[in-house]
From Swiss-Prot:
Gene3D superfamilies: Aldolase class I (3.20.20.70)
Residues at which [4Fe-4S] cluster 2 binds: 60, 66, 69, 105
Name by which UniProt lists this protein: 4-hydroxyphenylacetate decarboxylase activating enzyme
Organism this protein belongs to: Clostridioides difficile (strain CD196) (Peptoclostridium difficile)
Domain 4Fe-4S ferredoxin-type, residue spans: 84-115
Family statement drawn from the similarity comment of this UniProt entry: Belongs to the organic radical-activating enzymes family.
Chain residues that bind S-adenosyl-L-methionine: 40-42, 144, 193-195, 267
Amino acid sequence: MSSQKQLEGMIFDVQSFSVHDGPGCRTTVFLNGCPLSCKWCANPESWTVRPHMMFSELSCQYENGCTVCHGKCKNGALSFNLDNKPVIDWNICKDCESFECVNSCYYNAFKLCAKPYTVDELVQVIKRDSNNWRSNGGVTFSGGEPLLQHEFLHEVLLKCHEVNIHTAIETSACVSNEVFNKIFKDIDFAFIDIKHMDREKHKEQTGVYNDLILENISNLANSDWNGRLVLRVPVISGFNDSAENISDIISFMHKNNLIEINLLPFHRLGESKWIQLGKEYEYSDKGDIDEEHLEELQDIFLDNGIACYVGHETAF
């Protein structure tokens, strides 16, 4: 038996029986790490690859007199107010590597946002779930940005294809051309996000410019890759739903012979996670996008010869 240590990946969730993340019934693997910091992000716990802590006040039993976490933090990040409620110094907490508070809590009020898996451990989970897929399912790698852990992901993809498991990815495409091209050789289906076509507006709300993203999409569309690509746009009122931006997306798609897009209406489902991470959520007052407006946007794409799906209405 080889003594060589296997690659490990950091994963914050594995969801079985997913039906909106690619063809058929799928297992979706959420990998840690993301080069973007979208202000509306539904999974802000995924931004860093290294483990870090979240605190759920709803799960905490401080009102019932629980004190099991008292004195556990050796770094001075955890104190308590007069009501016994935990008060966290997130500037100290972000550098923690021992997580005594997590290990002490019976109620999962303190929890880690990442769990290590070896390549074989993750593939075993995927193979186990394959019994539920029938003939048209597979595995989808999401995040975060799964391409940030490209070495680990590459090994998992190779093992999946060894046993004919269909592979899909949900990605921002915000990685080097080299990494992007290497991984996509083993991808059968892809969702790639376009947040905004204007590079300055893109950076304002995501923290990065979109040049590399658009370059990777264009290169993929004009390559000999034979997988299926669906672009995705998280539609946010007042940010990327203008006639100008929609027109720019259509022009980009026509230029690159791209024929499918998925419009995802904005939601605030990740707001509680921001609070649990001690972060300010700037979109708390942002309203849901009007369904009639979404249908109007859909009609614009359809009128321009582009298959357009709203929400989870994808043509699987």
